[in-house]
Regions:
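Hydrophobic faces of well-ordered beta-strands that scaffold small-molecule active sites
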Residues: 2-9, 54-56, 83-89, 107-109, ...
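Conserved anion-binding
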Residues: 10, 15-25, 100-151
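Short catalytic helix/loop segments, enriched in acidic residues and glycine
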Residues: 20-44
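Catalytic domains of carbohydrate-active enzymes, especially glycoside hydrolases
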Residues: 41-57, 102
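Generic structural signal for hydrophobic
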Residues: 45-49, 77, 99-100, 127
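Glycine-rich, proline-tolerant flexible connector loops at the mouths of alpha/beta enzymes
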Residues: 51-72, 111-118
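Alpha-helix-loop-beta-strand connector modules within alpha/beta enzyme cores
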Residues: 64-86, 124-141
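Catalytic cores of alpha/beta
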Residues: 73-106
Length: 151
């Protein structure tokens, strides 16, 4: 068994949020825990414990007033553990190379390559050209939803 640590960053703070509670409008989420430590603290902790393959996730979108604070926390984590963490949350061709240069081992993409339940091969090719397939993780996250079928 492998432990894969995670650093979720929302509104510039390391948090554990209640699954499915994240709302872009108002930058709101129900919280289980808001840490008093910054993201670099956890990155150092994981590095010192020899835990690789963890990830840093930016939970604020680019339009959020908190985006820069969230992004700065993520960059501090990558600097504290270069090559030890993956990064996700709004990753696209415009920022993938910057995250890799900042120390991310991989970039995680979801919404950039998946639109309306379909894989965009064009977008996948674009991000692969920037990041390289050896540094690219496709996130196939799913969430239980009610499905209505009309007969």
């Amino acid at each position: 068994m492998k432990f894969r640590p995670c650093i979720d960053i929302h509104n510039g703070k390391v948090k554990q949020i209640v699954g499915g509670s994240l709302k872009d409008a108002g930058d709101q989420a129900r919280e289980n825990l808001v840490s008093g430590q910054d993201a670099a603290f956890y990155a150092e902790l994981y590095k010192n414990a020899g835990l690789k393959g963890g990830h840093v996730i930016l939970l604020n979108g680019k339009d959020s007033e908190y985006y820069e604070a969230t992004r700065n926390q993520a960059l501090k984590a990558l600097a504290a553990y270069p090559g030890g963490l993956q990064i996700g949350g709004g990753v696209c061709p415009d920022n993938a190379e910057d995250y890799l240069k900042a120390g991310a081992s991989h970039v995680i993409v979801t919404s950039y390559v998946f639109k309306d339940g379909q894989l965009s091969w064009e977008n996948l090719k674009k991000i692969e050209e920037i990041a390289g397939k050896e540094h690219l993780v496709l996130d196939l996250s799913c969430r239980k939803k009610t499905i209505s079928i009309l007969l």
